[in-house]
Curated annotation (Swiss-Prot):
GO biological process, any: branching involved in blood vessel morphogenesis
Name of the encoding gene: PPP3R1
Membrane topology: Lipid-anchor
Keywords attached to this entry: Calcium, Cell membrane, Cytoplasm, Lipoprotein, Membrane, Metal-binding, Myristate, Phosphoprotein, Repeat
Chief site of localization: cytoplasm
Family affiliation: Belongs to the calcineurin regulatory subunit family.
Binding residues for Ca(2+) 2: 63, 65, 67, 69, 74
Organism the protein comes from: Homo sapiens (Human)
Lipid sites, type N-myristoyl glycine: 2
Stated name of the protein: Calcineurin subunit B type 1
Length: 170
């Protein structure tokens, strides 16, 4: 990882060269088979993600080329969204993408149900969960199209300061 490798990463992230070096060491420790990319199992060895019911969604978002693994560039770009230097909109967009499973720019009733189901497991009956989903869509959907746009999502969660909790220490 010479200067030529880290320079572009500085351009596409909120990290400086030293932070990228530290993240490179962390990435290499996680990359148990030295393949140059992280599998789901390797990613799961991060203590911060082991108890997270949405870990698969996080991996799906980090994995921008869709090959099922996270390479170093995807890792840097993904973690950068959680940098203290990351802006509110970027963090909210990441949170939105957790729910927007089909990447169409909207959160549908079905997508909201699936993600909430990942979070609550069997603690709620599906009918109870569906009622919560329906009510959430009704409250958030200002244009009446039956789904939640990024703007509608921000109107609901933007004032909750969730972006301040979406930070990792590098």
């Amino acid at each position: 990882m010479g200067n030529e490798a880290s320079y572009p990463l500085e351009m596409c992230s909120h990290f400086d060269a030293d932070e990228i070096k530290r993240l490179g060491k962390r990435f290499k420790k996680l990359d148990l088979d030295n393949s140059g990319s992280l599998s789901v199992e390797e990613f799961m060895s991060l203590p911060e993600l082991q108890q997270n019911p949405l870990v698969q969604r996080v991996i799906d978002i980090f994995d921008t080329d869709g090959n099922g693994e996270v390479d170093f560039k995807e890792f840097i770009e993904g973690v950068s969204q959680f940098s203290v230097k990351g802006d509110k909109e970027q963090k909210l967009r990441f949170a939105f993408r957790i729910y927007d499973m089909d990447k169409d720019g909207y959160i549908s009733n079905g997508e909201l149900f699936q993600v909430l189901k990942m979070m609550v497991g069997n603690n709620l009956k599906d009918t109870q969960l569906q009622q919560i989903v329906d009510k959430t869509i009704i409250n958030a959907d200002k244009d009446g199209d039956g789904r939640i746009s990024f703007e509608e999502f921000c109107a609901v969660v933007g004032g909750l300061d969730i972006h301040k909790k979406m930070v990792v220490d590098v």
